[in-house]
Amino acid sequence: MAAVPELTSEMMAYSSNNENDLFFEADGPGNDVKCCCQDLNHSSLVDEGIQLQVSHQLCNKSLRHFVSVIVALEKLKKPCPQVLQEDDLKSIFCYIFEEEPIICKTDADNFMSDAAMQSVDCKLQDISHKYLVLSNSYELRALHLNGENVNKQVVFHMSFVHGDESNNKIPVVLGIKQKNLYLSCVMKDGKPTLQLEKVDPKVYPKRKMEKRFVFNKIEIKNTVEFESSQYPNWYISTSQVEGMPVFLGNTRGGQDITDFTMEFSS
């Protein structure tokens, strides 16, 4: 290869007797050196009058990139005898840059939206006119009320959340107003079970609720059903018997009641 006429002072700064300094003058250590970029186009380097000699002691990707940059700069400084082709630029860039995949991670649970979360307050009655009442801290019961006792019925805070929405199913969560209690569905003794679960008011409700809290609201004429998203074909149900707990059932149109009327509350 033709020797580089003379290294500039900036380039000489890279030359030293330290074994970790890998650049030398053309007349420096000669017998033990070889080019770490053997896959470069040597003929093009000869044509351009560029000689690169590097120690074989260290040859890593960082050095390869550095050498490639110098080669590219030297080639670009000199007038090109022929028109620069696209492949020429491509070969230069291939030595300078390394393609790396960009992995975008999203966390659906932390998804936030600027839009206000939609919610409504409502009261529910089953089609036999039984009201839903909080009988103790963590249990709902269905019973008939009259007079002043009607005020004992619970008011639900129904929020619209993300879920598997379809034409006739709208994902919602049902919390008891002014209490940190939400209806949820869990497996107990091998059977899907409805329960009231206490939550952190600083966190709930949120747009991406855990699936156990989500119900698919299905409107049928003037009534609504609430199907568990966690357990499809299981519905919030009441018994024909007075005062029984509200439960999760898988019988529609039978002895158990799955149809409710909904009254919006201010």
Curated annotation (Swiss-Prot):
**At what residues does the UniProt record annotate the site feature described as Important for interaction with integrin?**
169, 177, 179, 188, 202
- Glycoprotein as UniProt keyword: no
The UniProt entry, under Gene3D superfamilies, shows: 2.80.10.50
Record GO cellular component, one term: cytosol
Q: Which InterPro entries match?
A: IL-1_CS (IPR020877), IL-1_fam (IPR000975), IL-1_propep (IPR003502), IL1/FGF (IPR008996)
Which stretches are tagged as propeptide in the UniProt entry? 1-114
Extract the GO molecular function terms from the UniProt entry.
cytokine activity; integrin binding; interleukin-1 receptor binding
- Short name of any one Pfam family annotated for the protein: IL1
Q: Tell me yes or no: is NADP among this UniProt entry's keywords.
A: no
Described function: Potent pro-inflammatory cytokine. Initially discovered as the major endogenous pyrogen, induces prostaglandin synthesis, neutrophil influx and activation, T-cell activation and cytokine production, B-cell activation and antibody production, and fibroblast proliferation and collagen production. Promotes Th17 differentiation of T-cells. Synergizes with IL12/interleukin-12 to induce IFNG synthesis from T-helper 1 (Th1) cells. Plays a role in angiogenesis by inducing VEGF production synergistically with TNF and IL6.
Self-association and partners: Monomer. In its precursor form, weakly interacts with full-length MEFV; the mature cytokine does not interact at all. Interacts with integrins ITGAV:ITGBV and ITGA5:ITGB1; integrin-binding is required for IL1B signaling. Interacts with cargo receptor TMED10; the interaction is direct and is required for the secretion of IL1B mature form. Interacts with HSP90AB1; the interaction facilitates cargo translocation into the ERGIC. Interacts with HSP90B1; the interaction facilitates cargo translocation into the ERGIC.
Task: Identify its protein family.
Answer: Belongs to the IL-1 family.
- Give the note: IL1B production occurs in 2 steps, each being controlled by different stimuli. First, inflammatory signals, such as LPS, stimulate the synthesis and promote the accumulation of cytosolic stores of pro-IL1B (priming). Then additional signals are required for inflammasome assembly, leading to CASP1 activation, pro-IL1B processing and eventually secretion of the active cytokine. IL1B processing and secretion are temporarily associated.
Name assigned to this protein: Interleukin-1 beta
GN (gene name): IL1B
